Regions:
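Conserved anion/nucleotide-ligand pocket segment
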Residues: 224-294
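Conserved functional hotspot residues or short segments at active or partner-binding sites
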Residues: 314-414
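Short internal beta-strands
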Residues: 117-124
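Glycine-rich, charge-decorated loop segments at or immediately adjacent to ligand/cofactor-binding or catalytic sites
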Residues: 128-133, 202-224
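C-terminal motif of bacterial Sec signal peptides marking the signal peptidase cleavage site
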Residues: 31-32
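Glycine/threonine-rich flexible loop motifs
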Residues: 175-187
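Glycine-rich oxoanion-binding loops at beta->alpha junctions
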Residues: 136-165, 178
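Glycine-rich, aromatic-lined ligand/substrate-binding cores of catalytic
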Residues: 267-344
């Protein structure tokens, strides 16, 4: 049948011997469904479902209505693959951000009479109401009776038993495009478990609010942890779907396994598209400004400096009781999403970054850390969790550079070679121009 620019179903994947039979069957099925198909072998083991089928698949749920300029998320385009979910046992990896307009992904799938057998929950839990770093317990969802299996408790990777009654895993979580945000690590382990157990995985892509730039030191293998598993900069300029393609294509899964991966990409979106998240992705990233400042302020998490956890402005301020007197002060207290905030009940002199006119960062601002270092003087008073700081930075060099009094310009100059090499790798997996 004839394809058109605006009305076709395009698949993009790399020749992979073990999946050749599966791919052939897939193409036959797509042809039988009267869909236009184009094949491009370029992403190892991964299939990217690009454009619209000729007609909407009819199901008993409201079809989202968009203007031509609205970004459409992967979750908004369930019609692209909903038929292939029928008769399958489905697990979803999701949290409070997994919404189709005002309806949660879980409720949407159940309304379509699909067989959702379990939900995997990441850091902060299924409802996003658990403080950073706190263990998430497995439980039963009281509304649906479906098991909620924690991937941030006794184990961070689905076990063989967890997947024994599952055919396909759907991943839909809003990311913020920063290496130490742990949803990336959760996705890695889910991909790895699916690869080990022969399960298919679908990633519903979402815009990255920090996709418009790339910055920071590249993570060194010795500092791999759950707050950074891959050799990428702190800000990597990719959506979570593109990142999943990179994990597969670069062989970053254990034993260089390849996950049977489908990506449902966004539409009407580029990396330069400004996208304000409708739902906070975690308890302390509550505003556009906080999400923008997160790459610059998160390194403070390994210091004695407060970045506003336990206040109304997390990741919008920074301060310390031993800073010289300032016009702006704040006092952190335990509250929702911050059960034990740094400098709790102390009066912190500091700086309110909400007064800044710039709501969108274009680089990591090292001057906040340098200013705090200079105000505190004693490096022991400043960085009190050296090993954690190195894991966040992805190396041991940055801590030494701060201790030696390096300027932001001097520090940034050491990042350039790694960033240029990463850009060459990243380019292979980009879906949006």
């Amino acid at each position: 049948m004839k394809n058109s620019k605006d009305n076709r179903l395009t698949f993009k994947f790399q020749k992979y011997a073990k999946q050749l039979c599966l791919e052939t069957i897939l193409l036959i099925l797509l042809s039988a469904c009267n869909l236009g198909v184009g094949v491009d072998y370029s992403n190892k083991g991964s299939i990217v479902v690009y454009d619209e089928p000729k007609t909407w698949i009819d199901f008993d749920a409201p079809i989202p209505i968009f203007t031509t300029k609205d970004p459409q998320l992967g979750i908004d385009r369930l019609h692209l693959f909903v038929d292939s979910l029928k008769g399958k046992r489905i697990a979803i990896v999701c949290n409070q951000t997994s919404m189709v307009k005002d309806v949660h992904l879980l409720d949407t799938l159940l309304a379509l009479n699909l067989n959702v057998v379990k939900v995997f929950s990441p850091e902060h839990g299924f409802r996003g109401d658990i403080s950073a770093g706190e263990k998430v317990s497995s439980s039963i969802d009281p509304k649906t009776g479906i098991p909620l299996v924690s991937l941030y408790g006794t184990h961070k990777k689905p076990t063989e038993s967890d997947l024994s009654d599952v055919d396909i895993v759907i991943f839909d979580i809003q990311d913020v495009g920063v290496r130490f945000y742990t949803f990336l690590s959760t996705m890695h382990f889910v991909m790895e478990a699916c690869a080990e157990n022969g399960k298919q995985m679908v990633v519903l892509d979402r815009p990255n609010p920090n996709a418009h730039y790339i910055d920071g030191p590249i993570l060194e293998p010795a500092y791999k942890s759950f707050v950074g598993m891959h050799p990428v900069p702190i800000v990597y300029g990719m959506t979570i779907g593109e990142y999943a393609l990179m994990i597969n294509g670069e062989g970053w899964l254990d034993k260089k396994l390849t996950c049977r991966l489908w990506i449902i990409p966004c539409k009407n979106y580029t990396h330069k598209t400004k996208y304000v998240l409708p739902i906070p992705p975690s308890p302390n990233l509550r505003s556009e400004l906080a999400i923008s400042l997160y790459p610059s302020l998160c390194l403070f998490e390994a210091t004695t400096v407060s970045i506003g956890r336990g206040t109304d402005q997390p990741f919008e301020v920074y301060g310390h009781p031993k800073f010289p007197n300032t016009e702006f002060t704040f006092s952190p207290k335990p509250q929702f999403g911050a059960s034990n905030p740094p400098q709790a009940y102390c009066n912190c002199n500091g700086f309110n970054l909400a007064s800044s006119l710039a709501k969108r960062s274009y680089e990591i601002n090292l001057n906040y850390l340098i200013n705090a270092r200079d105000l505190l003087g004693d490096s022991i008073e400043f960085i009190d969790q050296g090993a954690f700081f190195n894991r966040l930075a992805g190396n041991a060099i940055l801590k030494e550079q701060f201790a030696k009094g390096w300027s932001a310009k001097e520090i940034r100059s050491t990042w350039k070679p790694g960033l240029e090499e990463f850009k060459r790798i990243r380019k292979k997996y980009l879906l949006y121009n």
